[in-house]
A protein has these predicted regions:
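The feature captures the beta-strand-to-loop junction immediately N-terminal to the Walker
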Residues: 37-39
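Conserved ABC ATPase "signature" region
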Residues: 94, 109-127
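Conserved ABC ATPase signature
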Residues: 131-135
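Catalytic Walker B motif of ABC-type/P-loop ATPase nucleotide-binding domains
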Residues: 156-159
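H-loop/switch region of ABC-family ATPase nucleotide-binding domains
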Residues: 192-193
Length: 241
């Protein structure tokens, strides 16, 4: 991987002038899935919301391919248990195409192809005309990821996409996201507490600690330097704990 997708320069993040992390400098590559780990309150969700444009940076800059980031370049999937009454899976996923539709909001043949392909990518082919609320939490999460895929953005940010899911669905979703990153050349950044799965499945780990910035490296290298132990205050690889 050699194509830089996201690059930050002394990025400082927070809210209401309260600084959560300062002077963050990192680069993410096209075609990789990065899992962001760290203790609660260290700024993981704040970073995602800042990159997505939902809240302003306090200082510094961040770019995509050396250009200032635009909302149309990023898809964001937040953690939430949605209940959408009387709405089909197709209609939920189609919301991701609305920025590209005609003035009247009509879907073109290409839009429909993208919707079906996105559902196929998340393993939900044939579910277009089923109702969203009839699906399990894991399936709903995959529908929302399919919606993000239909936006055709080079970057997808996900905040705790496996929350509330059982282990098989957690594994399935992370494996699917890694495959999408590699096959479609997307940059996927995930905030998660799934330490074991992140270490096994991500290309790199972004390890964040309160007020101390981030370390971005492979899980093997971070373990070798003791970074995980320093971040979480204990030897997370000790089977006796």
């Amino acid at each position: 991987m050699c194509n830089v997708s996201i690059s930050t320069n002394n990025l400082t993040i927070g809210y209401n002038n309260h600084i959560v992390q300062r002077d963050l400098n990192f680069e993410l590559q096209a075609g990789e899935m990065v899992c962001m780990l760290g203790p609660n309150g260290c700024g993981k969700s704040t970073l995602l919301r800042t990159l997505a444009g939902l809240q302003p940076a306090i200082g510094g800059t961040f770019t995509i391919s050396n250009s200032l980031i635009e909302a149309s370049q990023i898809a964001l999937v937040l953690t939430e248990r949605l209940s959408i009454e009387n709405t089909t899976v197709h209609d939920v996923v189609a919301m991701g195409r609305y920025p590209y539709t005609s003035f009247l909001g009509g879907l073109s043949g290409r839009d429909e192809q993208i919707i079906e392909q996105s559902l196929s990518n998340v393993g939900l082919s044939g579910c277009s005309h089923t109702f969203f609320n009839d699906h399990s939490d894991g399936e709903k999460q995959r529908v929302l990821i399919a919606k993000a895929l239909t936006q055709e953005t080079p970057i997808i940010l996900l905040d705790e996409p496996t929350a509330h899911l059982d282990l098989p669905n957690r594994i399935r979703i992370l494996q699917m996201l890694r495959r999408v990153a590699r096959e479609q050349g997307k940059t996927i950044l995930i905030s998660t507490h799934e330490l074991d799965l992140a270490i096994q499945l991500s290309d790199r780990i972004m390890l964040m600690t309160p007020q101390k910035g981030i370390q971005l490296d492979t899980a093997t290298n971070l373990r070798a330097t003791g970074a995980f132990t320093a971040a979480f205050g204990m030897d997370i690889f000790n089977p006796c704990l």
